[in-house]
């Protein structure tokens, strides 16, 4: 999965997909009542990027729905996965459940079109704080209450705080999550980070009793660091330059081992080294 980083304006969806992304990451900020409000990152952000592009969250979902609904004039067949980077740092811990509830309602209405030919992309809810695991509970219970539990088949999870892998496993246990787990590791492109924790995550994925289904690394903009991440066995790379990742994937060293994921590739299925 080539994951376009910080895609917060509708116009950027076309831009990143045309550069080779089959997945995008979108920031979601919340108001003080735990309503998802904007797709917005803010300053500071990655080096070389404009930090302040934004839409209202529900407006963005409408654009995203069009981009992922077959038959729509804005449809992109290859856009198959969306990571919502949920900026829950502005919320109190006890608001996490409400945030999950409100997020589910927004997606149901504006993305899934109440289950009637809505957007088809797989969704990853990426949460920065292990203490906010109840966001997952709120999300799940709301879709059940709204009589669309089947949509959970399209939803996966990520805790993005670079926490100890054992602590992440405990948070999933509390949330009752037993699959659909993506594990992120990384840092802003302005700084360097080694691959030690990525290797631990890959080892967990490849073990017989691990909780991780897929591992992705962020934010990778250079060919050398792309090769290092691929050599470590990641499933996804988040980048500001999808064309760089696509270029490296076309090198002879990688064409035999990797290919770009399509809609038929189940993102919750573990593919071991």
Swiss-Prot record:
Keywords: Cytolysis, Dermonecrotic toxin, Disulfide bond, Hemolysis, Lipid degradation, Lipid metabolism, Lyase, Magnesium, Metal-binding, Secreted, Toxin. InterPro entries: PLC-like_Pdiesterase_TIM-brl (IPR017946). The lineage of its organism: Eukaryota, Metazoa, Ecdysozoa, Arthropoda, Chelicerata. This is Dermonecrotic toxin LsaSicTox-alphaIB1bi. It comes from the Eukaryota. Its cofactor is Mg(2+). One of its GO terms (cellular component) is extracellular region. Its EC number is 4.6.1.-. Belongs to the arthropod phospholipase D family. Class II subfamily.
